[in-house]
Structures are given as C-alpha cells and as structure tokens.
UniProtKB/Swiss-Prot annotation:
The gene is guaA. It catalyses: XMP + L-glutamine + ATP + H2O = GMP + L-glutamate + AMP + diphosphate + 2 H(+). Homodimer. InterPro entries: Class_I_gatase-like, GATASE, GMP_synth_C, GMP_synth_GATase, GMP_synthase, GMPS_ATP_PPase_dom, NAD/GMP_synthase, Rossmann-like_a/b/a_fold. CDD domains: GATase1_GMP_Synthase, GMP_synthase_C. Catalyzes the synthesis of GMP from XMP. The active site is at C85, H179, E181. GO terms for cellular component: cytosol. This is GMP synthase [glutamine-hydrolyzing]. Residues 206-398 form the GMPS ATP-PPase domain. Its EC number is 6.3.5.2. It comes from Pasteurella multocida (strain Pm70).
Amino acid sequence: MNNIHNHKILILDFGSQYTQLIARRVREIGVYCELWAWDVSEADIREFNPTGIILSGGPESTTEENSPRAPEYVFNAGVPVLGICYGMQTMAMQLGGLTETSTHREFGYASVNLKAADALFAQLNDDVTSSQPKLDVWMSHGDKVTRLPDHFQVTAMTSTCPIAAMSDERRRFYGVQFHPEVTHTKSGLELLTNFVVKICGCERNWTPENIIEDAVARLKAQVGDDEVILGLSGGVDSSVTALLLHRAIGKNLHCVFVDNGLLRLNEAEQVMEMFGDKFGLNIIHVKAEDRFLDALKGIDEPEAKRKMIGKVFVDVFDDESKKLTSVKWLAQGTIYPDVIESAASKTGKAHVIKSHHNVGGLPDYMKLGLVEPLRELFKDEVRKIGLALGLPAEMLNRHPFPGPGLGVRVLGEIKKEYCDLVRLADAIFMEELHASGWYYKVSQAFTVFLPVKSVGVMGDGRKYDWVVSLRAVETIDFMTAHWAHLPYDLLGKISNRIINEVNGISRVVYDVSGKPPATIEWE
C-alpha cells in the first residue's frame, strides 16, 4: 500500500484569505499537506517532518515591528521553502534583505516578466508571442522587497515591482510576490507543481483510491471488532463517512437517521433507499418530527432555534445509542476546514469562527471514542472519494443544505404548515433549475418561508396567503457571493408554478442581495 503521508508539505498560515486555497492546490497536485499557524514550534515542525514548506500571504506589513515571522528553524530545516506574497517578504527580511511600503500598491491582474530561468519557473510562459517569457498573475500587496538577501537573484519583475520573484537555488529558497494559488494566476498550478514535485521531490500518492485504501486500513486498526454509531444525515460528509466505515467494519456500523421534519421533500425516503437498499447499511430510522416541532414551539430567534434543534438531536441520538449497548465509538463527518476553524490545530492558535453542527456537542457521559475518517480532507476531496465509493454525482454535487435544515429557512417560529409549504415550493424551484440547466450554474439555491401574508387573486376570488422568497447565488468560496441573474422567464415560470400548485402561497419574491452585505442564508 502506498504511504500517502510519506511526502508532505507544511503550509504556515500568516492570515491570507487564500491560505486554504494553497492547501487545496497542493492536494490537487497529489501531495498531502497540512496548514499550521505561523508561530508553530520547532519541535512540531521536526515531528511533522515536512518534505517542503510554503509560507502563505497575510494582511500584516513586514515593516511593522511586531509583524509575524516564520520560525527560524524553517530556514535551517534543509528542505525547500516557497514564500508567497507576505511569505516572500518575511523570508527576505529574515534572511538579511529589506522590505518597504510601496508607493504603488498592486491589487489585481499583472503581467510579470521572467528574468532568470530557475526551477520554479521551468517551462512556464503565458505569452508565446513575446521574446521574453511572461506570466499573467494575481497581485495583492502593499509592501515590496527592495533589497535581496545574500545569494538570492531576481527571477521576475513587473513595471512597478522590480523584485516580483526571487530565488536562492543552492538552498532551494523561492519567493513570489503574486498568488499562484488563485485561478486568476494562469500558470499558478504549474508553478506549484514545479515546487512540490520537481523541487521538493514529492511523489503524487494523494489520490482518491489511495486515500480510501489508507482510511479503511486505519479504521480497521482503530476500531477493530468494536461497534460504531454514526448520525447519518444524507449529506455529503456523513454519507462518505458511512461508506468508508461500512467498507472497513461492515455490520458493526450502526447509522442513526433522524427525520426531524425539517428535511427536503422526500429526503428521508431517498436516504433509506440509497443507503439501506442500495449499499446495505444498517440504518435505524427515527421518525422524530413531532418531538422537534413540539420543542421549537414559541421560539423565533435564529440562534435559539439552532440550539434547540441541536439539543433535541442530541437527545434523540442519545436515546438510540442507549439501545445499542455494545457501541464503543462515535463516528463524525468532521472535515479539514472544521478542524482549522474549530481550534483543533496542534498549535492551539486557530480561533473558533462558528460552532459546527458536527464538532462536539454530545454528552460527556456517552464515553465513546471518536472516529473521524474525513478530518484530513477538504470538501472537494470528500466528493471525489464519494464518487469513487459509488455515490451518484448528482447527490455529491447537490447544493449545500444547513444542518438545522428548514429550521433556518422558515423565518421566525417553526410550524409544520410552514415547513410543508416551503418544502413543496423549494421542490418546484429545484425541479425548474434542473430542467432549465441552471442548477449547476449557480452555487446554491433555496426557498425561504416569510411569516407574512399577502393578498392575491385566484379566479374571481381574493386570497390572503403566505409569501416565499427564492434565493440563488454564485460564489467561488462562499465568503462572498453575487445574486444569480436568473432569466426573467424562468423566474416567472417558477413563480406561477408555486402559486398555482402550492395551496397556501400567494406571492413569490426573488432575493437580489449580495454577500456582503447580506449573508447567503436568511437566518
């Protein structure tokens, strides 16, 4: 079996919004990597034993006295180092060079001229018509390197940035002022491949097939003949977790599927058919709609609704786990961004951005060991593994659905009537997006129930019924988003179908808010 962790890249995070993109690109190349805080200890770096190190960009200025610095050991570890943007600047400063605040800041597209051929830029050229090789890149910096450290050479420049890239080939230290990790940099992936594969010498063992083989072997070693319980939601993460565990331990996996009354139309039936009938998983189907809706009566504040939904889920899950007296392990679909965001890194420096629905939250007295087979994986990697395990592409590529489900898509107090209405309206919305070819053109689309009534006309009579809002957005990273410009005739068709086919809805509106200032979900 290939050792998928034998060659690995350490990425030190200086706070760039693009840092996770670096990790995803390295994984895409086929090499394992981890993302750690910039002030990681020498002992941790030695223990990780990286094949190469990448220093990310960041919002700070190297000209400030207390700005972040890479650990000195990074430059004494004997492995190649690539500094990106701020990473290049701190490399230059720490090795004896000089940086200054630029009078001309560069943000956006730029063309860099390659001055010297080094291993990083080998075979790269975005302008074959020019006598001098050029790259189309994405810049985002206010400082610049003005004096090179000893033994470095300038390898690229722009009209306003004389040192756009530098290298010390003897020590295998490289710096680029632009961002190769973003798709706007045309040959960015090729540049990173040059660093990771050619300079660091990493083998490309990080593939879906190898990851599955490694995960199954590790699960067998961790769990043995013990029994495992998993909350199966039908979402991508829990589904892939279930199939990996099923491959490793078979019937010793007990999946608990909780129908809380807040799911999409026919979702419970689809989950049972897919995982019970097709894959043969051992599934406990808990019909708990009344229990959830009773607990949510009178609660209209979004965070209070989330917490109550989470509490009732834990109670239901706990009730089921007590019936399984032989269970020793709890499986969760925690993925790598959850680990990064939830203060679970080795350095303890990461700060909690939000509480994730599947990180923690179960009673301490359950005394179960934790199994998290996806905790090293990004979402796109989980999807690729799901595909390799036999999950259908349409399920893996379905738009995101929040953990609390319709609980945050029914504004205000949650009632069964409201859930039923928004469920039917949303099914029509999705059906028409699929039929028109727009479903995969947008990043996320859904329907929101508004707890207000509006007058309408049906035949010769007037009716006073509820309002729903359609929401569709386009985004790359879900950090920012644009509202999707769906064709008017498509919106008109969806609106007419909802009003005519869903008894109780008299008006359909379309949300044209971007993020920021609005969030993608309404609650």
